[in-house]
Amino acid sequence: MFTINLLLLITPALIAMAFLTLMERKILGYMQLRKGPNTVGPYGVLQPIADAMKLFTKEPLLPSVSTTTLYMAAPTLALTIALLLWTPLPMPYSLINFNLGLLFVLATSSLAVYSILWSGWASNSNYALIGALRAVAQTISYGVTLAIILLSTLLMSGSFNLHSLITTQEQSWLLLPSWPLTMMWFISTLAETNRAPFDLTEGESELISGFNIEYAAGSFALFFMAEYMNIIMMNALTTTIFTATPYNMLTTELYTMNFMTKTLLLTILFLWIRTAYPRFRYDQLMYLLWKKFLPLTLALCMWYISMPMLLSGIPPQT
């Protein structure tokens, strides 16, 4: 039964990831006054299938100087972690209901650093290694901000459980009392998933794209799949933490539709930002985190800790 549930979770997530690539191209096309993919199938609907066939039927290339085991393991690890992150998400039922669901998400997402580091180091290419080091520095740096923001939401909900977090929002979304945290969370998720304007680790428009420069065919596709899976997962997590709809207001089917609509809107915002903003410089990226976001999130976290203590001394106003 667990295997069937696992397949029922993974298969729709993979299908959504495939068509997210098509949606991205279409949105980028229309924003640049062109049509995007429109040849393969009606209105280009079969383009993701054509891309998958092209990538997975190519001969896998292995650089002669690479460390074979780590080189092949890195993309597999990236996709495995991306799929593993979906297990505690309430949609409205989670595959595994962890009491420490938020901690599991935070710890597992941090493991993605290893796949990037392995890919850069095992390629034995200077360009790939430089890209991997920058990616690791960026991911770890923004992981700090994400952890502090999660701690602040825990103080409001009183539990690490994602289902309890939804119950907390019966009266109002956490977005309303913590909108500065929500804005910083959203920008940090852009950096965590290596999306524009923070796509310094994997510049698709550059000759040297980043840590995956030596990858081709199926192994490259696995990195690509992991990136888009993480985008959808991060937006689903944002929906759960800040704009969740309580279970008792909707039926299961309506809850799922509501949840996916919010996730889709956030994902479209990801793509819109890619179209609208140029890439940041690396020093600007680090300055934004260490000089702006980190002090602000720490100050807000202290605020959420101290306010209940201050208010506890006020007598009841009856």
From Swiss-Prot:
The gene is MT-ND1. Pfam families: NADHdh. HAMAP family: NDH1_NuoH. Disulfide bonds: none annotated. Belongs to the complex I subunit 1 family. The keyword Nucleus does not apply. One of its GO terms (molecular function) is NADH dehydrogenase (ubiquinone) activity. The chain crosses the membrane at residues 2-22, 70-90, 98-118, 140-160, 173-193, 217-237, 253-273, 294-314. Its EC number is 7.1.1.2. InterPro entries: NADH_UbQ_OxRdtase_su1/FPO, NADH_UbQ_OxRdtase_su1_CS. It is a multi-pass membrane protein. It is an enzyme of class 7 (translocase). Core subunit of the mitochondrial membrane respiratory chain NADH dehydrogenase (Complex I) that is believed to belong to the minimal assembly required for catalysis. Complex I functions in the transfer of electrons from NADH to the respiratory chain. The immediate electron acceptor for the enzyme is believed to be ubiquinone. Keywords: Electron transport, Membrane, Mitochondrion, Mitochondrion inner membrane, NAD, Respiratory chain, Translocase, Transmembrane, Transmembrane helix, Transport, Ubiquinone. It catalyses: a ubiquinone + NADH + 5 H(+)(in) = a ubiquinol + NAD(+) + 4 H(+)(out). Its main location: mitochondrion. GO terms for biological process: aerobic respiration. One of its GO terms (cellular component) is mitochondrial inner membrane. It comes from Sapajus apella. This is NADH-ubiquinone oxidoreductase chain 1. It is found in: Mitochondrion inner membrane. PANTHER family: NADH DEHYDROGENASE SUBUNIT 1, NADH-UBIQUINONE OXIDOREDUCTASE CHAIN 1.
